[in-house]
Regions:
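Structural motif
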Residues: 1-4
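Conserved strand-to-helix beginnings and helix N-cap segments that scaffold or border functional pockets
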Residues: 13-14
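C-terminal catalytic domains of large/alpha subunits in multi-subunit enzymes
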Residues: 18-273
């Protein structure tokens, strides 16, 4: 099982399960991911820095390495073999080159239990679990470049975005579908902030856009064709080469649209202020 930061649709549960399934060589359906209980979390810094994949993957690896080291010790005792002769395979541990000599993770967990009938070597504590903390040496650096093609109605000033492109480098893509979804979702949010959304007040200071009937969020009909191009430059600062990708889409669009509008109006020598 894995505890996770509170997600808001990023796909934490899927990505963290992918890391664990790969490290333990088990099907993803055998991995259980639990969302952190905010009433019991002793440290919480908010949803910032696009860091969940970086920090959680590091913690999953440290915890997995710790538990697997113990699991190999117990499996060696169960199979009467040297740890150096063992390998992970088939949702468990087996003797290299001998397919029939094998124990599953379930077998090893049972062998690690407390009690007189356990199969732990002398000096090995009961249980097969670990709580680990990952403290990266510094932040990772993700990069993105955005461009928009806009059309402006000369009579009304209406702005239409004909195409929007983002090139994004988030290191290793653990799940390309989720990566696309998060970047595109951020772009839509950024487009809304740049063109539609406004906290409007009257001259008495009363909020005029206090409901979704008045505060214009982008809908499917407002979203232009979006192209996301992923580059994969692994980060050297963590074991998997991952980086965050939650901010490039949301931050850039207002500035990109403003620059595109200025460029379109260049023949008229108009200035955007």
């Amino acid at each position: 099982g894995i505890g996770t930061p509170c997600p808001q649709g990023q796909g934490h549960e899927t990505v963290f399960a992918q890391f664990a399934a790969d490290m333990w060589q088990v099907p993803m359906e055998d991995v259980f991911v639990t969302v952190a209980d905010t009433g019991q979390v002793t440290q919480g810094y908010g949803t910032i820095a696009s860091r969940s994949t970086v920090t959680a993957s590091g913690a999953i690896k440290i915890a997995s390495d710790t538990v697997q080291e113990k699991a190999f010790t117990i499996a060696a005792n169960m199979l009467e073999a040297s740890e150096t002769d063992l390998e992970m395979r088939d949702s468990g541990i087996g003797v290299k080159g001998v397919p029939d000599i094998h124990v599953t993770w379930r077998d090893i967990a049972r062998a690690a239990k407390p009690g007189w009938d356990n199969q732990r070597p002398d000096g090995v504590e009961a249980g097969l679990e670990s709580t680990s903390y990952y403290e990266p040496p510094t932040v990772t650096w993700a990069y993105a470049a955005n461009a928009a093609l806009v059309w402006i109605d000369a009579e009304t000033g209406q702005i239409d975005i004909e195409k929007y492109v983002e090139v994004h480098d988030a290191g290793l893509l653990v799940n390309p579908g989720l990566a696309d979804g998060q970047v595109i979702g951020g772009l839509v949010q950024g487009l809304g902030g740049g063109l539609l959304e406004e906290l409007a007040y009257d001259d008495q200071g009363q909020l005029l856009t206090g409901s979704l009937a008045d505060y214009l969020l982008p809908t499917a009909s407002d979203v232009p064709p979006i192209e996301v191009i992923h580059m994969e430059t692994p980060s050297p600062l963590n074991a998997f080469g991952v980086k965050g990708l939650g901010e490039g889409g949301a931050i850039a669009p207002p500035v990109v649209i403003a620059n595109a509008v200025c460029d379109a109006l260049r023949p008229f020598k108009a200035e955007l202020s």
